[in-house]
Amino acid sequence: MAKKKKLSFTNGIAYIHATKNNTIITLADEQGSVLSWASSGSIGYKGTKKKTPYSAGIAAEAAAKAVIDMGLKSVEVHVNGTGASRDTAIRSLQAAGLEVTKIKDVTPIPHNGCRPPKKPR
């Protein structure tokens, strides 16, 4: 996970990558250097339990506690993906003690790009 060191800044960026099978939370400083990360799988959940919003919340709390110890106080959240656990992860970051200053959805949307496989058509 993260090294225990005091930071000279208090703002950061939280990246939440929510897929249909897992949720990955990465906390970085403003330059993009990763400070801490956690996922539903790294917390210890396997199989279908990784997709639950509860496991995403636990992962977000674990990642947030590591950076709060370093001195991070507020984050800007970038959410990517259409998974069910996006909102829970944001609420868990707030509940862990991080102030959320901005929420930005960075999910890529095709403007009639590649043809999808058989199922989504």
Swiss-Prot record:
NCBIfam families: PRK05309.1 (NF003698), uS11_bact (TIGR03632). One of its GO terms (molecular function) is structural constituent of ribosome. Located on the platform of the 30S subunit, it bridges several disparate RNA helices of the 16S rRNA. Forms part of the Shine-Dalgarno cleft in the 70S ribosome. GO terms for biological process: translation. This is Small ribosomal subunit protein uS11. It comes from Ureaplasma parvum serovar 3 (strain ATCC 700970). InterPro entries: Ribosomal_uS11 (IPR001971), Ribosomal_uS11_bac-type (IPR019981), Ribosomal_uS11_CS (IPR018102), Ribosomal_uS11_sf (IPR036967). Belongs to the universal ribosomal protein uS11 family. Keywords: Ribonucleoprotein, Ribosomal protein, RNA-binding, rRNA-binding. Signal peptide: none annotated. PANTHER family: 40S RIBOSOMAL PROTEIN S14/30S RIBOSOMAL PROTEIN S11. GO terms for cellular component: ribonucleoprotein complex; ribosome. The gene is rpsK. Gene3D superfamilies: Ribosomal protein S11. SUPFAM superfamilies: Translational machinery components. Part of the 30S ribosomal subunit. Interacts with proteins S7 and S18. Binds to IF-3.
